[in-house]
Amino acid sequence: MKTKKGIASIVMAVSLVLSVLLSLLIVGVDTSWGAVDVKLGKLISENGTTINYKMYIPKTASVQNPAPGLLYGVGGGDGVDAGHAFAIEASRRGMVVMSIDVPGNGLSESLSSVVHFDENNQAVVAQSDPTQGHELAYNYLTSLPFVDSTRMVTGGHSMGGMYTVQVAQNHQDEVKLQFNVGMNNYGNPELGYDFNFALIIGTSDESALVRTTNHCTMDDIYQNADLKNMFGLGEDERLEPGTVYGDFANETGRAVYTPHTLHIWEPYTVEVVEYFLTCLEDTMEVPNALPASDTVFVWKDYLVVGMIALLMVFVTSTACVLLDTGVFRELKLAPRKYFGFKPNSAVWWAAVAVLVVLCGYSVIWASMQTGSGEPNFFTRYGNSGFKCIWSLVTGASLLVYTAVFYALVGRKSGMKLGDFGLATGDDGRFHLRYIGKALLFAVILFAAALGYFLLYYYFTKSNLQWIVFEIDPIPMQRAGVKFLAMMFWMLPFVLMNSVAQRTVIRFEEGKPAATVKAFITSTAICVLLLAIIHLVFVGNAYFAYRTIFPDARGYIGGEQVMGIVVGTIIINTVGFFMNKKTNSIWPTLFATLPLVAWFQVTASGMTF
């Protein structure tokens, strides 16, 4: 595929300009337009675990005028920016906020020198780490001279809520409010609850639903004996969501709020944050009082989605620019004859449908293989383990499909391996030089992508996180243990996806309309069924209050599959345009493997 001279360079330049603009806007929202200082940091627990944090410090907070503090714990698998909604809104109101990963998640992980494996060869994170990590963060936050340690708030989403309630119980003289978002765990009842408490949980919270009888059963959560005991209700009394029990002004306030949202959406839902701000307003006087309805955090969500799209555009255009340079021009081989099914014929549509199914049918099953609680080879990779299984099964399925196509169609037409994109030259021979240059190309492209992200990350002090998709810097302790492993396990899907698509997609040069159609087809093959699975999962939870795939935590796959969709769209876009330009899968394979490994290592990085 020839690129009109300068088009790729212009696209790359525009993506960089827009990236700078969006980064500035993200900094503006995150810092309340300069009124709040934001910093990143790490603590080390007694077990040698890195505790990654992000801190928001209003410029009004000082030694002479200390501000109340908020310790926020994000949910399992998330990075610190999953707490941005609460951090932005609390810091706008003058609070010092510290958001941390649950140890074993995000960028909080055991140092490589202390990671060990059990008798089943599973990576072990000390069980005391999550509790110790949140306690360590709380002690650090309250030790800061500009924090009023007598006016503290703790809370978090999912696992973060479970561990911060333990912190609150350990510091009942200091903590004025504990809020659990999507977590019906209330610590140790014997320690008491001498602080205000709010449970904010979606009516369609799939995690809570699956822990009950799994259908329209959120009332089981509200009428839980431990929760009613905390609220001062008897066994025969009903707890009414939306009703305030006790008095928040006297630190005896209790409330359950039930916005209509899902577990994975709760930290991004305006109504959830407004309920938190209402409880905060009723609990204490903050330095900069604002109505609970005055929120701006959603703008960061929109901007981050834009940055994820720009990352895709930047990497794709950079690849095209590099391929037009003298160094890498020889990677562009002559177009090969198309031996695939006739476009728009009945058999072509059938083949596209088969490819769509093959790319998505195994994802929930794969999730259940690592979610049953029974250790196996892939559980060592945490939440990324099921994606390895999915890649293996999908790659094998696409290999069988390709073999059947070749036996029934390709061989009769004189199709050769080079016509599947395996060529390394135009003479039909294997050229090691071509492979070496493709590897060099991949290293440079990945360095450009990583450099682009790191410039963004250290400038904005934010990762790229949208619900279940996340990109972080690659932690050194994961680089050898997981990054190279993810490249290996993602190889079957990345390789066979490029090969199998040649049975239905023309990658040679064509008119713009044909290119757009081919790109849409290519993307649909990779992600259409995955997206449908996620939408069916979400629809059942949101509208029918039912968690499908409850067995062996298959619902985790229902949630996480959208992260696979976003990551796959990025790598398939890069790969599609590289395939069009090079007419070979090798530059595409080498260039996209490190990208997909990066996404798998840092997205949903739960490691226990």
Where are these regions (language model features)?
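Hydrophobic H-region at the start of alpha-helical membrane spans
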Residues: 8-16, 307-311, 351-353, 394-397, ...
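Short, Lys/Arg-rich N-terminal segment immediately upstream of the first membrane anchor
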Residues: 1-6, 338-344, 428, 432
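Juxtamembrane/start-of-transmembrane alpha-helix segments at the extracytoplasmic/lumenal side
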Residues: 294-308
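Alpha-helical transmembrane segments of integral membrane proteins
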Residues: 351-608
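A domain-start/cap signature at the N-terminus of enzymes
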Residues: 3-13, 17-47
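Alpha-helical transmembrane segments of multi-pass membrane proteins
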Residues: 19-26, 316-321, 358-368, 454
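Soluble extramembrane regions of membrane proteins in the secretory/endomembrane system
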Residues: 28-297
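Juxtamembrane interface at the cytosolic side of transmembrane helices
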Residues: 309-352
